[in-house]
Amino acid sequence: MSLLDRTLLEIFPQDSDSRDAAKARLDNLVMPHWALGDLMDLAIDLAGMQRTIKPLVDKRAIVTMAGDHGVAAEGVSKFPAEVTVQMVHAIIGGSAGVNALARSAGADVFVVDMGVNADLRDLVEQKKLINKKVGLGTGNIAKGPAMSRAMAVRAVEGGIDVAFALSTKYNIIGTGEMGIGNTTPSAAIAAVCTGKTVEEITGRGSGLNDAELQTKIDIIKKSIEINKPNSKDGLDILAKVGGFEIGGIAGLIIGCAAKKIPVVVDGYISTAGALIAAKIEPFVRDYLIFAHRSVEPGHVHMQEFLGCKRPLLDLNFRLGEGTGAAMAMNLVDGAKAILTDMSTFDEIAVTAPEK
């Protein structure tokens, strides 16, 4: 049995007893009923995920999956493909956006080479980079599949490996990514999974003008038409129109769900990874916390498909890397604090309101 198959056997829905116990406590906290709104709903989710009314979210990690894309050759990004490896060095050096925001959230940042088109063995040997490389960038989805099905499995299992390794030290993990051109495969994944049109799903990514946006839309339509991904098969979608880092994110989510670890999902590309994970195993949805809503127009459709009513933040983010996940972690900490640190009316002898 493969690592993926074994891991899927370990994924279960949230624990209903823990959810009920958390709700009973929250219903009686010293404040007007449900006065802290969505954070209280999140507190119930944390209890259900970790199977306790005293969840822990103090040991935090952001995992930035990196990979290159053959479709970048079609001009779907304002940035050249070599920026992927340059940004990998920046994140490892601690100077990127995700580093700044992760420090503010008390989170450690890990960078994973899923498929960067460069030899990064020196960074791996220095233990600055986690090596799960599947290939030197994907195929050009405008001309053929991104990867073979076997490579898709390797990408997902690479993410599972990372989740399992981090599960011994961390109790909450955020997703992130780096890969020039990766909003294009993400849009293709979103269109296939949600059934929305490519026009509804596709945005300007790194800042495309109107003509460039139309070219991007045409390329995504072409990639779906040529590759014909099976909308019911997550691995087929990943293989046909996905990316190595997107597969890594899917695997990270699957691995965290198996270990009962909450996953803070970052932006558009991370949510594409969540779509793949949910196609492979729908129960992973029970372990997702949606950090924010991206400027990318398709993000709302992707989140709604995954059952997200409203993400924690809506700040016009469109960077990725794990920046939104880092920003949201303090809100997750607040949700946990409401459940574990506030008193009930009975505990401090405060008169409860009339029912």
UniProtKB/Swiss-Prot annotation:
It catalyses: 5,6-dimethylbenzimidazole + nicotinate beta-D-ribonucleotide = alpha-ribazole 5'-phosphate + nicotinate + H(+). Coiled coil: none annotated. GO terms for biological process: cobalamin biosynthetic process. Catalyzes the synthesis of alpha-ribazole-5'-phosphate from nicotinate mononucleotide (NAMN) and 5,6-dimethylbenzimidazole (DMB). The gene is cobT. NCBIfam families: cobT_DBIPRT (TIGR03160), PRK00105.1 (NF000996). Pathway: Nucleoside biosynthesis; alpha-ribazole biosynthesis; alpha-ribazole from 5,6-dimethylbenzimidazole: step 1/2. The lineage of its organism: Bacteria, Pseudomonadati, Thermodesulfobacteriota, Desulfobulbia, Desulfobulbales. Its EC number is 2.4.2.21. It is an enzyme of class 2 (transferase). The active site is at 321 (proton acceptor). Gene3D superfamilies: 1.10.1610.10, 3.40.50.10210. Pfam families: DBI_PRT. Belongs to the CobT family. It comes from the Bacteria. Keywords: Cobalamin biosynthesis, Glycosyltransferase, Transferase. Disulfide bonds: none annotated. GO terms for molecular function: nicotinate-nucleotide-dimethylbenzimidazole phosphoribosyltransferase activity. This is Nicotinate-nucleotide--dimethylbenzimidazole phosphoribosyltransferase. It comes from Desulfotalea psychrophila (strain LSv54 / DSM 12343). SUPFAM superfamilies: Nicotinate mononucleotide:5,6-dimethylbenzimidazole phosphoribosyltransferase (CobT) (SSF52733).
